[in-house]
Amino acid sequence: MLAGMPSLSHLEQQEAADRIHLLMEQGMSSGEAIARVAQEIREKHQGDQVSVMFDDEDDDEEYQERPDDQADDDSEEDENY
């Protein structure tokens, strides 16, 4: 679970959205409908295991580019200091 919510398939996400819309059409506020559907999902998926993978490749490339750009700026500041 990520932030207390299980990982859902596309179909499960669509069903949840449809359920939220149905509850709202029946007069429930959006916040209450979302909270109710979220609770139903939590109860249905209680005990599920979710694997989370992070893709940090883009962050690493951006970090590698920055030091070169900043190195020139830093050296100019040092001369004027």
From Swiss-Prot:
Protein name listed in UniProt: UPF0181 protein Spro_2806
Stretch list, region Disordered: 43-81
Top-level taxon of the source organism: Bacteria
Transmembrane segments: none
Signal peptide as annotated in the record: none
Compositionally skewed regions (Acidic residues) per UniProt: 54-63, 70-81
Covalent S-S links between cysteines: none
Pfam families the UniProt entry points to: UPF0181 (PF03701)
NCBIfam families: PRK05114.1
HAMAP family: UPF0181 (MF_00507)
Family recorded in the similarity comment: Belongs to the UPF0181 family.
